[in-house]
Amino acid sequence: MRAVEERHPVLLEWFGRRQRDLPWRRTRDPWAVLVSELMLQQTQVARVLPKYEAFLEQWPTPAACAATPLGDVVTAWAGLGYNRRAVNLHRGAQQVVAEHGGALPDDLALLLAIPGIGPYTARAVLAF
């Protein structure tokens, strides 16, 4: 534990010099965090940046995403690859609306029951 405590200031200093200003670091909205986590799976940050904010402008909530045709979500996903993630995001949004009143749950087990959300993604959503 001592080694971690000693490295903490060094890591913070390094991050302060090297950090990138990424839009998903400026939000505490669980939906926005989920969208970013799914977009970033096996996809370069440079590909995600132009899509992320446009996606959230069009679908700022799970309810907005759930109400749109799946084809529109997949079309907006174009260029990110692995369209199954877009399908799962849409299905997950529909489930969130149907089972949780449109708000992402703040419970690990409930998040894991949503399509496309695994342990890492669920914990990332809960961290914010």
Q: Where do the PLM segments sit?
A:
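N-terminal polyanion-binding entry modules of DNA glycosylases/AP lyases
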Residues: 1-114, 120, 124, 128
